[in-house]
Amino acid sequence: MTGRQRTTVVAPDRPVQDATISQLTTRVWTVAIDGYRTIVVEGETGIVAINSFGTPSAQTKYRELITQTFGDKPVVAVVASIDHLDHTGRLGPFANGAEVIGHELGQAIAFGRGLPEQKLADTVVTGPVTEIERAGVRLVLRYPAPTVGTGNLAVDLPDDDVVFMVGLQSGARYGIFPDFHFKHFLRATSEIAALGRRYFVPGRSEVMDAGQVRQALEYVNDFQNACQRCLAGGEVPHWLLEPTTAYLHDELSSKWSHLEGYDPVAVGLGGLRVVCHYYMGGWWLDDTDHHELLYDHLTVRTYREYRERLATAGTGRA
């Protein structure tokens, strides 16, 4: 008898509908493709890019925009800021030999997933703060706590007054808040916002200034609190979409219905997920007071052993 084979299902490719690249500072540009967003930095000897997008067409368009803007200047380093495939699922083809940098926790997930296109990092950082320099660009890679996904990094560019981080958005298009870790999300994201950078670049939606970041944090806080009241009040059948939608819309609409993407049904769907978060006490170690235990999980230990074998073999590259 053979064991059941596990398969990673990836999103089908689709034509790019909308793609732009625009300048934020002297050397930092933001790329937006069909609702997703990232940044690239023009260093002295090459380009430092963040993430790869998640489909072949988006990854190809990303490369085209870089070439159109910077000519034959090579991409020398790519930071994989998160484990999610829609942001980093095409690291291998996009990096094309460039150094890939990622956080140990996110890389352990990618290692366990085993998707060839999601190339593993050549340089692995760990812990809450790591400062590196590539092509004359100073990057501070910050991991304050679980926020979204696993090993989600804030890529801080202090010399450029820019920070990039997947999670927070300027509007209300959060859907079901996939893989958000509400135990730490607001505190950790607020810690990054407190850096006071001129530009806060999210992984989706529009670039935000300090005022928009404060508003975005307040919306998520109000959403979480409304979901807590929905559960704790004991009067709403919170396992059903319609009554949950009605309750949350009544709680939130007067203050937040002006947000781009606000929709009562979407609020209800997201609310079901968040209420379940509180009802069940969160998800796994990420949503506990002791999230540092993630570093001792079997997946992470196995990934470390894999890297040790690489080092012993003398390759050092994934």
Swiss-Prot record:
Catalytic activity line of the entry: 2,4-dinitroanisole + H2O = 2,4-dinitrophenol + methanol + H(+)
Which keywords fit this entry according to its UniProt record?
Answer: Hydrolase
Q: Summarize the record's induction comment.
A: Constitutively expressed.
- Please state the Enzyme Commission number of this protein: 3.3.2.14
Which species does this protein come from? Answer: Nocardioides sp. (strain JS1661)
Q: Which InterPro entries match?
A: RibonucZ/Hydroxyglut_hydro
Question: What is the protein's quaternary organization?
Answer: Part of the complex DnhAB composed of the 2,4-dinitroanisole O-demethylase alpha (DnhA) and beta (DnhB) subunits.
Determine the domain of life of the protein's source.
Answer: Bacteria
**What is a single molecular function from GO for this protein?**
ether hydrolase activity
Function statement? Involved in the degradation of 2,4-dinitroanisole (DNAN), an insensitive munition ingredient used in explosive formulations as a replacement for 2,4,6-trinitrotoluene (TNT). Catalyzes the removal of the methyl group from 2,4-dinitroanisole (DNAN) to yield 2,4-dinitrophenol (2,4-DNP) and methanol.
Q: What is this protein called?
A: 2,4-dinitroanisole O-demethylase subunit beta
